[in-house]
Amino acid sequence: KELLDKAHSMDMHILLDLVPGHTSDTHPWFQEAKKAKKSEFSDRYIFTNCVWEAPSEYRLMCGICERDGNYLVNYFSSQPALNYGFYNVTHPQWQLAHDSDGAKATAEALKDVMRHWLDFGVDGFRVDMADSLVKNDDEKIATSAIWKDVRNMMDKNYPEAALVATLKEPSKTAASIWTFTLTTPETATHVFSDFLKTARI
């Protein structure tokens, strides 16, 4: 809080690094999700329906949870993927649709995290891999819908807050994920040009 107050007193803004695609495997949500007993966190991450189900097209950590299933990771074994659902469901035994209750609950949890930090005083977020939330979403249709909902929430309650995206496929997704303050060289030019008009350098 002291850092925020000092930065704001100097007309500076602070953006937090937001990683919405996964958590640590030590996160309390995941500690509950990997238990055999069902809970509100059982669908927060992507688990197969049994330990023998391990499709080769996904990065899965196998046979290490109390729960009968393997969990999907985004990159490393310590990064269980949060479950925003699948746009194209190919394994209905364990994949949730992007508009299912479980997937929607994850998107709401993301907004809760953002609201917490915006209420604390941060000025926005740099969003890591913003176009990789919903799985099997090649055209980023469902992922874009999540960010449009987030942007609507921010415009209503935090209109000065910024979202800066990093994208896995910027040439493919920058046009569709239009809710970010910065996504392309063109938007960056406009934002920084506006800043330079009033900045004290």
Residues covered by each model-derived region:
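Conserved beta-strand->loop/alpha-helix structural units within folded catalytic cores of enzymes
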Residues: 3-19, 117, 122
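Alpha-amylase-like alpha-glycosidases and glucanotransferases acting on alpha-linked glucans and related
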Residues: 25-132, 145-201
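Aromatic-lined carbohydrate-binding/catalytic grooves of carbohydrate-active enzymes
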Residues: 1-2, 12, 18-28, 129-144
